[in-house]
Amino acid sequence: MKHQYIRQKNIRQKIKWMLVLLMAVSLSACGVKEEKNRQQAEENSAEESISKDGTYEIAFISGEGELDDAGFHESSWEGIAEYADENRITYSYYRPANDTRQAREEAVRTAAKKGAKIIISQGYPFEEVIAHMQNEYPKIQFLMLDAKPRKAGQKAELASNVHCILFREEEAGYLAGYAAVCEGYTRLGFLGGKEIAPVQRYGSGFIQGAEYAAMEMEREITLKYQYTDTFLPSDEVQQKSKEWYEDGVQVIFACNGGASVSVMQTAEELDGKVIGVDADQSAVSPTVLTSAGKNLKGAVTEALDTLYENGGVWSGKQAGKTITLGAKEEGVGLPQEEEAWRFENFTQRDYRKIYRGLKREEQEILSGTATMPKTERVHLELPE
């Protein structure tokens, strides 16, 4: 799987255009409300996504946040849209009305009623939902990103109609931390969203990458580390990033989904730098130094391709199984396109060297979901 990081300049326009033509489904606690916008235009690339009979074969159900988040949701949706358009398959997007299990279950049921043959869900909020519904809908194939079906307090159990894709976020974070220190930054910040496993892995890797570079360059690094308990833009996130920049932090790894916009706004005001997350976010703000990315688009398109090649059901290598993608599989990394490469001292040759080391597993990187990594030259500043 090659690096297929998304260029964000055209993403929002394409997505918003698709949503005009697709069925936009919103859910309420009392039932389902469908909103159809019938506006169409000539020569539309998303034309094949429109269903003549009101059914949609591929269903995407997002988690918390907006679809056009320039990251996690948007990257996955781009993969779905690209594959479906190329293969003339109908597809639709369903957003739960609120952040509750009931709303997410209602989204799954709506997608099923609308003819979904495969339902793609994102993130930990769907663990319990799919754990209960994988057996209720045995003929529907489920693709879970960044999560596995798991009932409360129990181990994950995957039915044969479920396939899960996880990522080694610690490796992406490692690359970002290493690059930031090699670039010359000595005062870093990590501002995570909710304290969940993928975010923890990003943070742990960021610390370890900064430590490795600091040891090589014999530098002392300070790193503020905190979670904000949200993936949405907020005044609180903006205020926290303002405090950090004013306190001397030079670059913040904004590992908090849509809330990264709040960090970028502050960085623009205070001449700070930001490290984006999940996808190439260089087009979102000129303050984005780089982005610790996951190849969500490539992972989704490859999974769909394999599914349809096998007649619309998961193959033996996928059915009831989980794969984890890292540098070895080229599933994580920093964007290398010219317009996204904003380093002055850290070169692409430096990047390729450290990336090869990860692929060959020359460095042992801890996931960091249990304990914080130990450091000598990176001095962590945690909230009291």
Predicted regions: what they are:
Residues 3-18:
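Bacterial N-terminal signal peptides that target proteins for export
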Residues 33-384:
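A residue-level marker of the well-folded mature domains of exported/periplasmic proteins
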Residues 26-29:
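C-terminal motif of bacterial Sec signal peptides marking the signal peptidase cleavage site
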Residues 21-24:
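Short, linear, compositionally biased motifs with a strong N-terminal bias
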Residues 1-6, 33-36:
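N-terminal amphipathic/basic-hydrophobic helices that include classical n-h-c signal peptides
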